[in-house]
UniProtKB/Swiss-Prot annotation:
Pfam family, one: PPR
Matching PROSITE patterns: PPR
Protein name: Putative pentatricopeptide repeat-containing protein At3g47840
Homology family: Belongs to the PPR family. PCMP-E subfamily.
Repeat (PPR) residue spans along the chain: 39-69, 70-104, 107-141, 142-172, 173-203, 208-242, 243-273, 274-308, 309-343, 344-374, 375-409, 410-444, 445-475, 476-510, 511-541, 547-577
BP-aspect Gene Ontology terms: RNA modification
Residues of the signal peptide: none
Region feature (Type E motif): 582-657
Superkingdom, natural source: Eukaryota
Amino acid sequence: MISSVRNCGTIQRFCTTSISLLQKPVEENIVRISNQVMVKFDPNSHLRSLINAGNLRAARQVFDKMPHGDIVSWTSIIKRYVTANNSDEALILFSAMRVVDHAVSPDTSVLSVVLKACGQSSNIAYGESLHAYAVKTSLLSSVYVGSSLLDMYKRVGKIDKSCRVFSEMPFRNAVTWTAIITGLVHAGRYKEGLTYFSEMSRSEELSDTYTFAIALKACAGLRQVKYGKAIHTHVIVRGFVTTLCVANSLATMYTECGEMQDGLCLFENMSERDVVSWTSLIVAYKRIGQEVKAVETFIKMRNSQVPPNEQTFASMFSACASLSRLVWGEQLHCNVLSLGLNDSLSVSNSMMKMYSTCGNLVSASVLFQGMRCRDIISWSTIIGGYCQAGFGEEGFKYFSWMRQSGTKPTDFALASLLSVSGNMAVIEGGRQVHALALCFGLEQNSTVRSSLINMYSKCGSIKEASMIFGETDRDDIVSLTAMINGYAEHGKSKEAIDLFEKSLKVGFRPDSVTFISVLTACTHSGQLDLGFHYFNMMQETYNMRPAKEHYGCMVDLLCRAGRLSDAEKMINEMSWKKDDVVWTTLLIACKAKGDIERGRRAAERILELDPTCATALVTLANIYSSTGNLEEAANVRKNMKAKGVIKEPGWSSIKIKDCVSAFVSGDRFHPQSEDIYNILELAVSGAEAHRFDCTLKRAFGVNLYS
């Protein structure tokens, strides 16, 4: 310990002496150490030693006191600032070098470093001026300058300029090839990335492990498992298969291409696994809908002492949301806090999505308001969460807040607001969102367009919905389905069916949602035979397995036609797990037809699935009442009271100025409820005075106010 302290003191004295010597002429910089050895002091060596030691402040002091820096000293100090991610200071120093020290001309080394600084700081204007300088001074012929220039354009998202620089480079090496392939793949241009990879393979440059890994990522993006297997063969030949980054990319490629078993086999055979290995498997399970497997994999990962990263938690919160496991999500939230990842934007967004999906909007809102920074995903998530939960007023408030923050809305945020406008039949609010979509150039977005059609249809303006549909592309399946559904809901079944038939003639391939819409049109128009025709078409012509929603349409169609026995038979023969929706459809039909026994059976099936279902109990009581079985009806209502079952009241909404308010019967939660009820009582009492006169007028045709 004592010797270490002495050494530190010696180093400190040496550094102090060195700095003072820099103030003397170079020829006087001779130091006698221990009165025995004579050494000449080299400022650049001392500068590099300070830089290598990570002491940037001392290095800058030494540099500033140097009477005349050369290209080596300038490059050293600029490079250190770039390494420290202080690109702005690096660019200032480079500018000073060119202005103050005319004797020093930039070379390939310093130009490469400064181009990297431009990429880090996204200073594209400065970078382009350096590009021009490199062309003018013929420094662009250097493979290092070319690679740095290529990388700079790639970093700022100008991948086409990167490709142009690459094509003009007289010499290329493995780093250059890998840089252009990486840029293309990260930009989502997987096919071009693989084209460059093929050219590289044909050249004399050999791919390294990272090049193979990025090429496998391109295969995954294109779902090109055949090409991926070919690369896998090359990886085996080169002996890279045990390299962790390559093994991870191989496993990810197979799972993303649907070859889950091959990906799992690679994962099991890995000699070592890191967070990327585990996370890719978790993501793969989540992608194919096996969320429970994803959770089990996460537990194994934690037991393996591998700490999760942001992507791991984002995938896990998504899995919990899909499973509606709020408790699991809350436990993960505790893990995030313990690992200090709560400031991660992607983690916060995924947590907020989980809370919203699981119905805990209070926690989602608290999380949102506590975020240090927010992106458009944050805003879209909180707006969508409130809108999808039926709290349109809160959704619009958050949207207004987002607009005040200057954040540009996404298609998802606009679609959520259009959905809530349609559900609450607030056409003025929907039109304002439509205007915003036009303002931000999102009106041609498929999601926004279909949401506009739905909104106008639900608000009763089928004409405006039809006008928007007339401007859509023919192959927009979502908008077509929305329009068919809009016609069906407006009782325009003929228009809905005609549109569907017309689309089939032009080669349109319907999906399962389209068939739900057209079956709904058949249901509303009572076209039983045509409904069965389409129901069979989706299975025989398009090889689609009917979902429970399709069966629900057919059960409704049979019930409306009075064929309750056939409807019950279809429900019992369903391959899907029976839910309360189809049984409720049958129960309501039994009420209309007075079919007590079948209605009781339907109610029993519903109560097996949900013992506290108010709709089933109320409808069953009404069936008994309408058929004179008052004692049975009373027993059902007593049973409801004993279980604490309360029928959920219906609600209405009203828009006053820019505020939408939703309310139920007897609602007193509005801040101005006392004033509202006072005015209502005045209106009722005023109407009561004219009630008798109005009755006389209706009875005898006498106008008492003439």
